[in-house]
């Protein structure tokens, strides 16, 4: 884990911590949205799929919160070097997580349609694929929050 000295202005550290917390909440919500959308697909549960579709708005709101917070930090704190890279990374991560949430919503939408049709060939690989996606999201966010380049590079080897 990379260690960084605290900033002279404590509120700057608090702002960065708040941004990390928003990204972490987004990641957790993405993980659950993916798992639940695949569960709805596999169990052919249209009601569960509808809940997932409605929950996508929470991810959209968190992305907007992350963007607003990042812009505020940049405007008020004028971060440099590592701090600026972390904030820009958080902005990009928020966008990617929101897109992942959209994919989960899309799975849920399709599962509602599939629930009304006849079962088709084996789909046993879908839950395993979802498990791997959730694992990679979790490990990526851990590397980001811990500011650990070794963990981040290890993800490239997967």
Identify the residue ranges that each predicted region occupies.
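Cytosolic, long alpha-helical scaffolding segments
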Residues: 1-158
């Amino acid at each position: 884990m990379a260690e960084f000295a605290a900033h002279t202005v404590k509120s700057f550290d608090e702002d960065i911590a708040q941004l990390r917390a928003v990204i972490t909440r987004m990641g957790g919500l993405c993980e659950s949205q993916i798992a639940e959308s695949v569960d709805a697909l596999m169990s052919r549960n249209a009601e569960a799929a509808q809940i997932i579709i409605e929950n996508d708005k929470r991810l959209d709101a968190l992305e907007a919160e992350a963007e607003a917070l990042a812009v505020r930090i940049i405007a008020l704190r004028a971060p440099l070097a590592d701090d600026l890279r972390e904030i820009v990374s958080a902005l990009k991560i928020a966008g990617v997580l929101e897109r992942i949430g959209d994919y989960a919503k899309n799975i849920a939408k399709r599962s509602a349609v599939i629930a009304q049709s006849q079962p088709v060939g084996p789909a046993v690989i879908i839950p395993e694929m979802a498990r791997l996606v959730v694992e990679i999201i979790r490990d990526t966010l851990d590397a980001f929050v811990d500011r650990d380049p070794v963990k981040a590079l290890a993800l490239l080897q997967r």
